[in-house]
Amino acid sequence: MRHGVKTSKLQRNASHRRALLANQACSLILNGRITTTLAKAKALRPYVEKLITLAKRGDVHSRRLATATIHNTTAVKRLFDEIAPLCAERKGGYTRIVKLGQRLTDSALVAMIEIIDLPREAAEKEEAPATTEATA
């Protein structure tokens, strides 16, 4: 019986799963959004939510716990200095999962997970085409 079991094993052993979640959390913190399978996104969501809640405390002990969890000082710095102040008013639900359909190669369900309160500057820069006219 699996009563009370909240985590998904993702077909990996414990150390591989821990490394996978740490790497994906680091990528999500640095980029703001990532595209992955739906199962990995659902497993990543509580992991990142706990990190953001930890970062909202802002003390040295929380910073050390976050560094021990994701092993990337650049991501920890961005988490504490940029993301945590943006999420200060929100009590939870810092991430959003958007289902994107199936992958063509293996029909795996693909989803995009993103941090809600981040500004969309990067997305707007990608969408706006550069209008440069050649003068001849």
Curated annotation (Swiss-Prot):
Pfam families: Ribosomal_L17 (PF01196)
Gene Ontology terms: biological process: translation
GO molecular function, one term: structural constituent of ribosome
Gene Ontology CC, one term: cytosolic large ribosomal subunit
Signal peptide: none
Gene3D superfamilies, sorted: Ribosomal protein L17
Protein keywords: Ribonucleoprotein, Ribosomal protein
Family classification: Belongs to the bacterial ribosomal protein bL17 family.
Subunit-level organization: Part of the 50S ribosomal subunit. Contacts protein L32.
Protein name listed in UniProt: Large ribosomal subunit protein bL17
Species name: Akkermansia muciniphila (strain ATCC BAA-835 / DSM 22959 / JCM 33894 / BCRC 81048 / CCUG 64013 / CIP 107961 / Muc)
Gene it is expressed from: rplQ
